């Protein structure tokens, strides 16, 4: 039971969206330029999903907050659902899933105003949090898809897939809260990526 589908509970949320690539892959094959249309979720649908997940967590209290993820978090190069309109912060406020502390975010943001980390350091932080990203040191296509998936989940107001201060501050705040033991382990990026 090492495959994700063998050890997970999936909830398929129907909310049709459409994405199309508007970039020129011949001009810049390492860039993703997707234009997407994501409809809003009806309140009754969100209430039903909240209720369902609460029941699942009662039966499986061993599920960690960081293990409640989106399809796009697991397969960022292939999936975009549930999209930027899914209310992750609201779910966190109901005791479901992970979210960053605003004080940690502000602390990280102040540090990053002096200097943004390298692409490799951000890739490492994404890997520590659990995103499938190869450590290349280049803001390549696979990195942009991973960053975009992260942004769809934690910073849905702007999900370009490009590394910026706000995205990095959120990522670092989440790792501080949920993965501090791995952040302090200097071999965690290598081990997490093997």
Question: Which ranges hold each PLM region?
Answer:
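Surface-exposed patches in mature extracellular/periplasmic domains of secreted proteins
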Residues: 56-70, 135-138, 159-162
């Amino acid at each position: 039971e090492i495959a994700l589908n063998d050890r997970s509970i999936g909830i398929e949320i129907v909310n049709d969206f459409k994405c199309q690539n508007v970039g020129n892959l011949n001009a810049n094959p390492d860039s993703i330029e997707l234009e997407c249309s994501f409809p809003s979720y009806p309140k009754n649908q969100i209430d039903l999903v909240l209720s369902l997940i609460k029941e699942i967590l009662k039966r499986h209290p061993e599920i960690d907050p960081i293990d409640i993820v989106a399809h796009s978090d697991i397969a960022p190069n292939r999936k975009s659902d549930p999209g930027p309109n899914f209310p992750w912060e609201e779910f966190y406020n109901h005791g479901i899933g992970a979210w960053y502390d605003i004080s940690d975010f502000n602390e990280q943001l102040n540090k990053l105003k002096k200097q943004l980390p390298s692409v490799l350091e951000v890739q490492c932080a994404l890997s520590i949090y659990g995103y499938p990203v190869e450590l290349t040191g280049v803001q390549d296509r696979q990195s942009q898809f991973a960053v975009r998936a992260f942004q769809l989940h934690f910073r849905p107001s702007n999900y370009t897939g490009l590394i910026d201060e706000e995205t990095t501050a959120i990522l670092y705040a989440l790792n501080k809260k949920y993965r501090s033991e791995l952040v302090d382990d200097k071999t965690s990026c290598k081990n997490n990526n093997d």
